[in-house]
Swiss-Prot record:
The gene is psaC. It comes from Staurastrum punctulatum (Green alga). Its cofactor is [4Fe-4S] cluster. [4Fe-4S] cluster 2 binds at C21, C48, C51, C54. Gene3D superfamilies: 3.30.70.20. This is Photosystem I iron-sulfur center. Keywords: 4Fe-4S, Chloroplast, Electron transport, Iron, Iron-sulfur, Membrane, Metal-binding, Oxidoreductase, Photosynthesis, Photosystem I, Plastid, Repeat, Thylakoid, Transport. The keyword Electron transport applies. One of its GO terms (cellular component) is photosystem I.
Length: 81
């Protein structure tokens, strides 16, 4: 099972998700599309354990973790977006 962390353009650059991640999957990168000029990125998705702590920490509720089951259909991990 692979996890893919999706960061949408409503990220406010607060870094709470980065600090909440127990496996250090997330990092902040420069991004002109938000107020803080930085956005969360997930370059190490293979290390994601799907705990969703990043989602819980996100004050804007626009961070989502989705589970991809190989060639099967994508299923949401209880997210609303």
């Amino acid at each position: 099972m692979a996890h893919s962390v999706k960061i949408y353009d409503t990220c406010i650059g607060c870094t709470q998700c980065v600090r909440a991640c127990p496996t250090d999957v997330l990092e902040m990168i420069p991004w002109d599309g938000c107020k803080a000029s930085q956005i969360a990125s997930a370059p190490r998705t293979e290390d994601c354990v799907g705990c969703k702590r990043c989602e819980s920490a996100c004050p804007t509720d626009f961070l989502s973790v989705r589970v991809y089951l190989g060639s099967e259909t994508t299923r949401s991990m209880g997210l609303a977006y």
